[in-house]
């Protein structure tokens, strides 16, 4: 089932999420619905708060790992920095160069509640950081300079008014 994606201005996006405690059938259904929503959008990652669920969980597919679920993520060892364009399903349309670690480790739990650890480089590292920001009540525009934030919000307004077209989003399969 596709779940409506919450958009910039929704308070759930600015609220730190709570830990996942119940790894049950309801969580598995939610993960499947989130993946379906992410692919439909299209996007490469989707966090609980983006669908109105204030729990520390996200789903992703970077085109290499396949559909993956992560609960209660904690970011660990990080290395290097890279600035690449970044967008967000909750800020539909605009992209802006955003500084992130080039490589980062993410520890959390899978759908069974078992511990998992993954190290991401490039796009996967960006996904880990972007989605974890959502769980902390932050959006990618919170990482931008005042000038960058204004540029993203101005582009979003132009899109809303029909004066600009939203940029095509990246899909997990690269198309």
Task: Enumerate the predicted regions with their spans.
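Positively charged
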Residues: 1-175
């Amino acid at each position: 089932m596709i779940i409506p994606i919450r958009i910039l201005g929704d308070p759930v996006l600015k609220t730190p999420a709570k830990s996942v405690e119940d790894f049950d059938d309801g969580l598995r259904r939610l993960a499947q619905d989130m993946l379906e929503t992410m692919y439909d959008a299209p996007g490469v990652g989707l966090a609980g708060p983006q669908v109105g669920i204030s729990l520390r969980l996200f789903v992703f597919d970077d085109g290499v790992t396949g559909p993956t679920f992560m609960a209660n993520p904690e970011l660990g060892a990080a290395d290097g920095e890279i600035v690449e364009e970044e967008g967000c399903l909750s800020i539909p349309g605009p992209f802006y160069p955003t500084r992130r670690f080039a490589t980062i480790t993410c520890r959390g739990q899978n759908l069974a509640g078992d511990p998992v650890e993954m190290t991401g480089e490039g796009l996967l590292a960006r996904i880990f950081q972007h989605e974890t920001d959502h769980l902390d009540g932050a959006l990618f525009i919170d990482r931008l300079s005042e000038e960058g934030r204004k540029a993203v919000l101005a582009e979003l307004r132009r899109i809303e008014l029909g004066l600009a077209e939203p940029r095509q989003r990246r899909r997990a399969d690269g198309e």
